[in-house]
């Protein structure tokens, strides 16, 4: 319960808090590890240099400049870490292609993320602190029943998370299909333009 009560301690920093100077890889890892403590469950690192390099290779993250990373690199890495257990790299890349096209968009995206994050923390505190307190209150003398009810709550949360994951996947899939149709239309227009050019050339020859 104390962990839930102290969720406010894990608030995401304001954009102005990010370093104004470019950082080397080890500095990036150190800075972001502090910001990602909320999702750290065990002793395994949340972010490593090899992960960052893989994101660059996958075109999910822009390459560093002279081995240094800028603010938008940090923001994008933070955004990746929060959803990488839910979304595939290709899906995150697709989302970024719409929402994080440049540094200006990256800043706006982070501000929306920060706002959503804070609201979700409040929702979680309001909803689940009440439920946990009710479990403890109604079963105050039965430790086994408390454990069973808490595990049932954990299972229900997992099920809810899975349903939300499915909805997110469906939305991304539908958007990808729409995106492909747009590409097909563009390709069709290009083909028609080329055909018109060829027809004009042939008419001139005749």
Model-predicted segments: where are they?
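Basic helix-turn-helix/winged-helix DNA-binding cores
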Residues: 1-100
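Intrinsically disordered, low-complexity, charge-dense segments enriched in Lys/Arg
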Residues: 95-98, 102-206
């Amino acid at each position: 319960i104390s962990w839930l009560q102290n969720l406010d301690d894990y608030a995401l920093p304001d954009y102005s808090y990010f370093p104004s100077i470019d950082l080397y890889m080890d500095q990036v890892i150190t800075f972001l590890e502090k910001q990602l403590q909320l999702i750290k469950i065990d002793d395994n690192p949340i972010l490593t240099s090899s992960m960052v390099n893989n994101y660059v290779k996958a075109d999910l993250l822009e390459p560093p400049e002279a081995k240094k990373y800028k603010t938008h690199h940090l923001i994008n890495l933070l955004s990746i870490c929060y959803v990488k257990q839910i979304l595939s790299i290709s899906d995150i890349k697709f989302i970024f292609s719409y929402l994080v096209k440049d540094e200006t968009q990256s800043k706006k995206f982070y501000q929306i993320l920060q706002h959503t994050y804070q609201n979700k923390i409040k929702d979680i505190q309001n909803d689940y602190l009440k439920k946990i307190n009710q479990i403890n209150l109604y079963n105050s003398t039965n430790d086994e029943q408390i454990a069973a009810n808490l595990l049932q709550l954990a299972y229900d949360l997992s099920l809810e998370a899975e349903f939300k994951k499915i909805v997110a996947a469906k939305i991304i899939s539908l958007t990808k299909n729409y995106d492909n149709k747009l590409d097909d239309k563009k390709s069709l227009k290009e083909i028609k333009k080329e055909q018109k050019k060829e027809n004009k050339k042939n008419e001139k020859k005749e």
